[in-house]
Amino acid sequence: MITINKKTVRSTVTPSAGGTQSNELQAAIKSVTSSTTVGAVFLYDTSADSDGGKWRSKCKGLSWFDEASSTTRSARSEFPAMALIVADSVSGVTIYDLDDPAMPMWMVFNGLSGNYDTKMLWASGNAAGGGLFALNGRVLLGRTWVDFSSDEGGYHHTSAPKIYTGGIGDRNGTTLGGSSIYGAIADNTVNDISATILEGAEIGALGLPIPTVAVATAGGVSVIHPSGDVYNQTHTVYGNNQANSIFWDDKGGLSWASRGGNIYNLHLSNPLYATSSAAPDKIFYTLNNVGSYFPYLLGGTTPITARAGISGEGFASGSSNGLSLVKQNTGNLEESAVTHINSTYNSGYQIGDIRFAGLAGSRTADRSVKANTLAMTGSVTAGVVATDAELGAYSGFSATDYLSQAHDADFDFGTTDFSVMFWVKYSSASGGEYLLKRDTTGGTSNKFGIYTGGSNFTVYAGTESDLSALDVDDGSWHQIGLVRTGGKLYTLEDGKYGASGVASVSTVSNGSAVLHIGQSTDGTSPATNASLSLLRISKTAPSPKQIADIYAAEKPLFQAGAKCLLQSGNNAVNGLAYDKSTSLLTVAQNITSAVPGATIFRGLEQVATFDGKDYDAWSGYSIHDVSTAGGVSVYSRQAGTGGTILDLPALDVRAELNEGESKIPDDGKLHFSASILGATATNIAHIPVNENEAVFVSANVRANEYGGNGERAFYQLKSIYRQDIGGNIVLDDEISTLGSETTASMVAKFDSNTPKGAIEIEVTGVALKQIVWTASVEVQRISEKLYER
C-alpha cells in the first residue's frame, strides 16, 4: 500500500527492497486491447463531476455496488475515480479501472444492438455507435444510457423511449419496462452525443445535478433536459440537417457539424428550450463552402471529421484539410478569431472578416478565404523565426526585392474599422523603412501603412497617423500593427493598444492603390533590416482582449525549437480530444509515412507527439480515435493490426489526484448570459419549478451594447411564484421591479412558462443594436427537490 496525504492508494506492484517507488508512480504506456472493432473510447475523470467524484462513495446498497467478482465484474465495489470506457461492436462495453496501474476490467456490458430488449448499453449498430460520453455518474452511448447514481438504464427513441426493469446489476439479463420520462428525439440514427450541467439544473440521485444531453442525429440535434423534455433543432443547411461532432462549451453554448456533402459548423449560444427549424445563432462555413459568414474553417468535401470544445467558448475543428482553432467572441460571433494549421503552415489568428493572412509557410500564399495571393519581385528570403523552429520568417527586402499585390477592393475599407497585424524582428531600424504600405505608386492621402523611422514605428490610415512607444530595435520578435475602431487610430504593441490613439475618420479606399510588403509603393524606404512573419489584414478591429489573447498564443512560436504544425503530410484529422486538466489538445491523424499519428498542442504550439507503432504491434501509424482526461490519454487504431493503447501519467496515485473539488458555485446564485441583436423578446434564463412548490426569485439583470456603452440598462426583479399539483406556474406576488435604461423600449422581466416547468427571464433590446445581457439569480424555495447547484 502507498499512503499520500493520509489517504491509502491500492498498489498491485510491491516496492523493491531498496525502498524505490513501485511502478505505480512511474509513467506507463500499455495495450488495452488488440481489437480493431472498437467504435468509441472515453476517459471518464470523475474529479470533473459536479461533486468532484464524491458520489462514488455513496452507492452502497445499489444493485451494482457489491456484485461478486466474475468475468463481467471486478471485486472492487466503488466506481473508479478514473475510468476508461471502451465500446467494441463485437464484444460490448468494458469499463477499465485506471486507479489500479494494472488497468483491470471493472465492469462489462455485453449487449449489442440485437439485444436492445434484454441488455443495457448496446455497443453496435447506428443506435449505439454514435458517440460515447460520461458525466455525473451517467454513461451515454448513442441512444443508450445508464446512470450509476440512480441505478437504472434505458434508451432514447423517436416514438417509444424505454427504461429497463431492475438495476445495473441486471445489465446483461434485463427486460424492457415502461416508457421513460424522456420525449422523442429527432432520429434513431445517432452520430454523436455530449452532456453538460446547465445553470439551475435539477438535482438527482446522490445530490448530483442532472446533465442536459445533446444528441446529434441523422435528422438534426435533440436536446434532452433533466425534466425529460426533449427539443429538436432541425435547421436544414442546403438540403441537409444531419448532425455529428457535437459538444457543449463552458457557457452552455452548443456546437455541432453538418454531415452531408456541404459541410458547416453550427452554433447555438443558449440552451434549446423549444423545437425549432430556424437557423441557429451562428453558422461557421468552411473554405470549401464559402458563404456570407465569417470566420471560416478549414474544410473538405467530406464531413467534418472531429470537433472538440477547448478552453472557454473556443473549439477545435478537424477535417481532411487540417485543423482549425476558434476563439469565439460571444459578444459578436462574426468577430471571432480562427487559426488554420496543417503540415505546411500555421496561419496565426485571423480576426473576423479577414482579407489576407500570409507570410505563413510561404512568401506569397494567402491562407485566408480571400486567396489574395502576392507576387514576388526579385528574391525574398524564406527562413524560420528561430533555430529549429517551424514558423516561417521572411527577410532580404530591398528596392528590387519585395512582395506586392495589384489593386484589390478587399482592402478598400473606406472610413470604417479595419486592422493590420504581424510580427517583426529588427537587427537595426535606423533610417526610414516601410514594413507595409497600400497606396498609389505616386502617393496619395488615401493610404494605410506601417513605417519605422528609428526604434519606434508609425501607423498611417488616410490622413491620420499615430506613433508607437514600443522599441522594436532590440533584435527580438515583436507583434505590431494598427487598428482603426470607433473613429480612432491606434498602434498595436505586443498585445496592447497604443496608449491613447488619434481621431481617424478619413477614407483609405483608393481605386488605384497597390499593396507592397517590405518597401513603400514607390519602391523607396525598403525594410532591409527587418524579418516579418504572420501578416494579417482584416475588415474587423480586434478588441483589446482579443489582441492580448492573440499575442499570448503566438509568442511561444517565436522561441528556439518551437513547433506549430501537424505531422501528417496528408493533413487529414481523424479525432480530437481536449484535456481541461492539462490544457492540451490531441489531434489524431491519418498517416501515410513513418511519422507519429498524434500531434499534441498547448494553444498554438505543438508540445508533443505520440506514435502508437512504437509501443505496440500496430501495422500502421494512423490513429482513428482519441480521448484524454486527467493527464491520461487513450489512442485507438481500427484498421490492419491495431487496437487501443493507454498512456498513463508519470505520477499515478490517480484515486488521490482525481477526487476533485465541488463545481457548485460558492455564491449560491445562478448565472446566465446572452448576446442578442435587435429588439426581439428573448428568454435568457431558465429556472426550473416543480409541482407543489413555491419560490422567491431575485434577479439582477445588466445590459451593455457590444463594443461600447451606447445602450445600457440595469434591472432588479423580485417575485414569488408557485405551482400547485396539476396546475400552472402562477405569480403569487410581484414584490418589486426596478429598472434604468438608456432606451425606454428596453425590457427585462420574469415570465412563467408552465409547459417547460420554469420561470424565465425575458429581455428586449434595441433594434439593430448588439446587446450583451447578464443575469445573476438567487432562488429560495421549499420543495422535495433542490435545484440550486
Question: What are these regions, as identified by a protein language model?
Answer:
Residues 422, 480, 532-537, 543, ...:
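Extracellular beta-strand elements of beta-rich domains used
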